[in-house]
Regions:
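Acetyl-CoA-dependent GNAT
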Residues: 4-75, 86-87, 92
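Short beta-strand-to-coil "C-cap" segments at the C-terminal boundary of structured domains/repeats
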Residues: 132-134
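A generic structural signal for beta-strand entry/edge sites
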Residues: 64, 100, 127-129
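Conserved GNAT acetyl-CoA-binding A-motif
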Residues: 93-106
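Conserved active-site alpha-helix within GNAT-family acetyltransferase domains
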Residues: 83, 107-124, 128-130
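Active-site acidic-Proline motif in GNAT/NAT acetyltransferases
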Residues: 73-79, 107
Length: 134
């Protein structure tokens, strides 16, 4: 089930994000609690919850059309959770009137393959990451 994230969810969101091996931002000092709080306070961060536990989340920034995060606990991959969270994030951005939806991810990762399969296209690079747009 998808629901809006709450501040009390932040420790679990950080845990999920930090557990993804292919994540360049695994260093906890690079993504702060304040970053998460902004998304909780400004609708755009959603969690997938099962049996009382969070297994994935997405975050979208309506200020600039950016998908800031999409992470699923590895034990729950391959079940459509990422796709559902991704669609929710895109809906938030489109509803906010964002003319450009974009994100960055490292090349050669599962995330890159996911975004390509979703029909997003690479439009450049930024700080060693691919820039995808829809």
């Amino acid at each position: 089930m998808i629901r809006n994230a709450r501040r009390t969810d932040i420790p679990r969101l950080k845990e999920i994000r930090d557990s993804v091996r292919e994540n360049r931002l695994r260093d906890p000092s690079r993504v702060t609690a304040e970053d998460y709080c902004w998304f909780v306070d400004n609708p755009g961060i959603f969690v997938w919850e099962e049996k009382g536990g969070i297994v994935g989340f997405s975050a979208a920034d309506p200020r600039n059309g950016n998908i800031w995060a999409l992470f699923v606990d590895e034990a729950h991959e391959g079940r459509g959770i990422a796709q559902a969270l991704f669609e929710r994030a895109c809906t938030v951005l489109l509803s906010a009137g964002c003319p450009r939806l974009w994100l960055t991810t490292s090349p050669g990762t599962r995330a890159e393959r996911f975004y390509r399969r979703a029909g997003w296209r690479v439009t450049g690079s930024r700080a060693g990451e691919l820039v995808f747009e829809r």
